[in-house]
A protein has these predicted regions:
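All-alpha prenyltransferase/terpene-synthase fold signal
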Residues: 1-324
Length: 324
């Protein structure tokens, strides 16, 4: 069994040595740039860990794992363009370093490359892999569309939000694990349980992201705290604050959400205080713990010896141990 750290090293080395020998270079340069920015490489790591539950040669599916990482970074490239973001992982975003049209075209090419790389598997698995990958890619687009529509809605329900983050975030983690299982000839039942494990850990991971944006340490979290509050992003926190607030709290919350001219720190402090009064802090922690607990049940159901699952368990715990 490989450790997650060994797998991460394999993934990074493989990505670094992928060749782009097509022309024009100006189309492929932004792709190399995006994939060289680093990142946690969670999705390829999960795929290889799932494969390694059954087979001892995870290096055999590095191309498929890196296909998923290529796809994930394609979505980030286009997300940055839609959000008009300046920076990603401490680097200029593609549309800022080059231009909007280059970001669109290089992003589109990344999507095609992701499919080309994913297709490099044996024929018996090809249809199952591409069917799952295609449905997942469609679901992620659906999740992104819901997320954009929520920006202009003030009646978003908790269950709608959970479904949105399932589509936008969870299904790609789930897909990574299931593809790893399929390529390793796991049983259909094991592959499905690994998918559900990924789905639940993805929900916990995204809800924790919401939580850390309010209660995290910016030095550890890696970005400025309170960004979701200042942009009025419909998160688990804000949705439940509106749902559970009394009249006075709701009125103050509405005033801050409606404000066009405000002091950033004052707004973050005021909304955080309201969250504390309403009990959103504990509510969010309980929900994160619930989904993390559910994920463990699905991993428990995977029919391989416990010692083989240990590395995947440790990796899931590490995903959830970002500092508050």
């Amino acid at each position: 069994m490989k450790t997650a750290d060994e797998i991460l090293k394999m993934v990074n080395e493989f990505l670094d040595h992928l060749s782009y020998d097509r022309k024009p270079e100006s189309l492929y340069e932004p792709i190399k740039y995006v994939l060289s920015m680093g990142g946690k490489r969670i999705r390829p790591t999960l795929m290889l860990l799932a494969y390694n539950l059954y087979k001892e040669n995870p290096e055999d599916i590095l191309m498929n794992a890196c296909a998923l990482e290529t796809y994930h970074n394609y979505t980030l490239l286009h997300d940055d363009l839609m959000d008009n973001a300046d920076m990603r992982r401490g680097h200029l975003t593609v549309h800022k370093k080059w231009n909007d049209n280059t970001a669109i075209l290089s992003g589109d090419s990344m999507l095609v490359l992701a499919y080309q790389r994913m297709m490099q598997c044996d024929a018996k698995h090809l249809k199952d892999i591409l069917d799952l990958f295609t449905v997942t890619a469609l679901e992620i687009g659906e999740g992104q569309q819901y997320d954009m529509e929520f920006e202009t809605r003030n009646d978003v329900k908790e269950e709608e939000y959970i479904e949105m983050i399932r589509l936008k975030t969870s299904v790609l983690l789930a897909c990574a694990l299931k593809i790893g299982a399929i390529l390793a000839d796991a049983s259909a039942e094991d592959a499905d349980n690994l998918y559900k494990f990924g789905e639940q850990i993805g929900l916990a991971f995204q809800l924790q992201d919401d939580y850390l944006d309010v209660y995290g340490d910016s030095k550890v979290f890696g970005k400025e705290i309170g960004g979701d509050i200042t942009s009025n992003k419909k998160t688990y926190m804000l949705i439940n604050a509106f749902n559970k607030a009394n009249d006075a709290q709701r009125e103050e919350l509405t005033r801050w959400v409606s404000a066009r001219d405000f002091d950033r720190n004052e707004k973050v402090d005021a909304v955080t205080r309201l969250y504390n009064e309403i009990g959103i802090d504990q509510l969010a922690q309980d929900k994160i713990a619930y989904y993390f607990g559910q994920s463990k049940k699905f991993l428990d159901a995977v029919n391989v010896p416990e010692e083989k699952k240990e590395e995947l368990r440790k990796y899931a715990q590490k995903m959830m141990k970002r500092q508050y």
